[in-house]
UniProtKB/Swiss-Prot annotation:
GO terms for biological process: translation. Belongs to the bacterial ribosomal protein bL21 family. HAMAP family: Ribosomal_bL21. This is Large ribosomal subunit protein bL21. The keyword rRNA-binding applies. InterPro entries: bL21-like, bL21-like_sf, Ribosomal_bL21, Ribosomal_bL21_CS. Part of the 50S ribosomal subunit. Contacts protein L20. Pfam families: Ribosomal_L21p. It comes from Borreliella afzelii (strain PKo) (Borrelia afzelii). The keyword Cytoplasm does not apply.
Length: 103
């Protein structure tokens, strides 16, 4: 059983008992989480599609931790100008455990 859920404007596939890697959430929202914007639910081949969301459905999750992803390096070099720029970025993600899909 899985569901497609919209969290902070992005869509994720949520499976019961598995972790979701989402963009960092604010400290106020941590602890027990519940997301009501479920787009699709698939249970044993029976598919429910929302218009745009499935009515009376939600996903209950538990916050686990924040982690940083691998560093992404952006490098720009201008030939014959003696100019170059190197910038690194590490995105922070929150890991949440999907406890239950309710519908």
């Amino acid at each position: 059983m899985y569901a497609l859920v919209e969290i902070n404007g992005k869509q994720y596939k949520a499976v019961e008992g598995e972790f979701l890697k989402i963009d960092k959430i604010s400290p106020i929202e941590k602890e027990k989480l519940e997301f009501n914007s479920v787009l699709l639910i698939n249970k044993d081949g029976e598919i429910k599609i929302g218009k745009p969301y499935v009515i009376n459905s939600s996903i209950k999750c538990t916050y686990k931790e924040d982690k940083k992803d691998k560093k992404v390096v952006s490098y720009r070099y201008r030939r014959r100008k003696s100019s170059e720029r190197k910038v690194g970025h590490r995105q922070t993600y929150s890991y949440i455990l999907v406890d239950e899909i309710v519908f």
